[in-house]
Amino acid sequence: MKYTIDDFARLIDHTNLHADASNEDMKKLCDEAKKYHFKMVAINQVQSKFCSEQLKNTDIDTGAAIAFPLGQQTIESKVFDTEDAIKNGANEIDYVINITELKNKNYAYIKEEMKQMVNICHKYHVPCKVIFENCYLTKEEIKKLAEIAKEIKPDFIKTSTGFGPSGAKVEDVKLMKSIVGDNVKVKAAGGIRNSDDFLAMVRAGADRIGCSAGVKIIEALKQRMQDDNVTTIEINR
């Protein structure tokens, strides 16, 4: 498939999830998203209203992070926070699974949590992304989560929060994609800092990229295409 610069930009969730991010930082994030035509801004739940107002009358989504970054909230509180974020303008949701219950092999809990989160998101026609936080998981646990997701059908499964010991890995993206196929999309996030990282994740099967380096990545891709005198880059997946 051939990608233009705008195609690449529309794969990016432009991210600022720092605890000390000010309204000025959020405005900058939204302004950059508008300038580069990114798909979404990824922000903490409390900033949903501010960012959605900044992005009013655009096709750029406001993505709220729920139970972030540890996932250590009850299902009920995650559902409540999700609905609150949506009512305050969020139109995409990224939530972190309860890793403790996964480690306990309480797959019924994980399945119920995912089902309730998908249901509350889809009630409002909002995409739901499930964050695995792969750095804490074995390959078998990643596989098990992907199998559950294939059954429950969230819109995306996601590699990482970006706040753990490590972020997205090409082999994990390939594994996740190999299980869910075209039924569920895959988002890679965490440690994607340059255009080579970005292209590697897309080639591995990522349908969305979460990163704070979106501007740097798009500018580098523009330069690469200019140097090669091309308007598209072909990606074989």
From Swiss-Prot:
Family annotation (SUPFAM superfamilies): Aldolase
Q: What is its main location?
A: cytoplasm
Task: Write out the GO MF terms.
Answer: deoxyribose-phosphate aldolase activity
According to its UniProt record, which reaction does this protein catalyse? 2-deoxy-D-ribose 5-phosphate = D-glyceraldehyde 3-phosphate + acetaldehyde
| Subcellular location per the Swiss-Prot or TrEMBL entry | Cytoplasm
Q: Which HAMAP family match?
A: DeoC_type1
Superkingdom, according to UniProt?
A: Bacteria
Q: Which InterPro entries match?
A: Aldolase_TIM, DeoC, DeoC/FbaB/LacD_aldolase, DeoC_typeI
- Please name the catalytic residues of this protein: D94, K158, K187
A GO cellular-component term linked to this record: cytoplasm
Q: Which CDD domains match?
A: DeoC (cd00959)
Q: Name one GO biological process term.
A: carbohydrate catabolic process
Per UniProt, the keywords (alphabetical) are: Cytoplasm, Lyase, Schiff base
Protein encoded by which gene: deoC
Q: Which ranges form a coiled coil?
A: none
Q: In which pathway does it act?
A: Carbohydrate degradation; 2-deoxy-D-ribose 1-phosphate degradation; D-glyceraldehyde 3-phosphate and acetaldehyde from 2-deoxy-alpha-D-ribose 1-phosphate: step 2/2
Name the UniProt record assigns to this protein: Deoxyribose-phosphate aldolase
Describe the function of this protein: Catalyzes a reversible aldol reaction between acetaldehyde and D-glyceraldehyde 3-phosphate to generate 2-deoxy-D-ribose 5-phosphate.
EC number in record = 4.1.2.4
Q: Report the family membership.
A: Belongs to the DeoC/FbaB aldolase family. DeoC type 1 subfamily.
